[in-house]
Swiss-Prot record:
It comes from the Bacteria. Mg(2+) binds at E124, E126, D155. This is Putative hydrolase BamMC406_5393. PANTHER family: FUMARYLACETOACETATE HYDROLASE DOMAIN-CONTAINING PROTEIN 2A (PTHR42796:SF4), FUMARYLACETOACETATE HYDROLASE DOMAIN-CONTAINING PROTEIN 2A-RELATED (PTHR42796). Keywords: Hydrolase, Magnesium, Metal-binding. It comes from Burkholderia ambifaria (strain MC40-6). InterPro entries: FAH (IPR051121), Fumarylacetoacetase-like_C (IPR011234), Fumarylacetoacetase_C_sf (IPR036663).
Amino acid sequence: MKLLRYGPSGQEKPGILDADGRIRDLSAHVPDLAGDVLSDAALARLRAIDPATLPLVSGEPRIGACVGRVGKFIGIGLNYADHAAEAGMPVPKEPVVFGKWTSSICGPNDGIDIPKGSVKTDWEVELGVVIGTTCKDVDEARALDYVAGYCVVNDVSEREWQIERGGQWDKGKGFDTFGPIGPWLVTRDEVPDPQRVDLWLEIDGHRYQNGNTRTMVFTVAQLVAYLSTCMTLQPGDVITTGTPPGVGMGIKPSPVFLKAGQTVRLGIDGLGEQLQSTRNAQ
């Protein structure tokens, strides 16, 4: 299934794409795509519904983040060896974990606010993993059983705040609008191997990132298992799993960063696309 949330910010309703790619309303069946609605049992109940029997959503509504009430938004750094190289950092022996504030979450097409004074706002297309079942100390072999599905994430990053100003990466990762998620939550049965998906990103039509999750340092299963040893993962938690090479700070001889008035387009095969305009934060 391709699940989504549509409507004004803060008033999103749950929906599903039908066979023709049209949005059907799910709000008579579930209040939101959040919490226990993401469990295997609840998703099985949604799967049993014929989308053609659901109300058709008219027009072109705003698409919100594909998960509601996210409890934890967990980032993984340097998870592609070639990205670590372009960043001038060693390939990690254990996952690099940081937090993205949930206040950074926005819809896939809502736009990116460049922070006041920023000249180093950067892009990162990433595979997002949405937890569906509470898990703690799970084995790698069973880790994917706890995943509800997958989505596109743009891990927007302000490199000066992330790298140059001391402290933790979190500072440069959590600005408002730095966490576009969606458009769809694609259930895990439709992504048989999360280590075999292509991901890409363009700025103003120029392709900067082309990658495949097969080159991850740590697989999705390894990340879920690892994280579950140091925290309890809960339904609706989102893990954004790292980016392939081609980010702005890695461009030689001179880095390239986002400016107001640009268009960012990114996507992952089978998971949909995002389209964002950049603007200066007010």
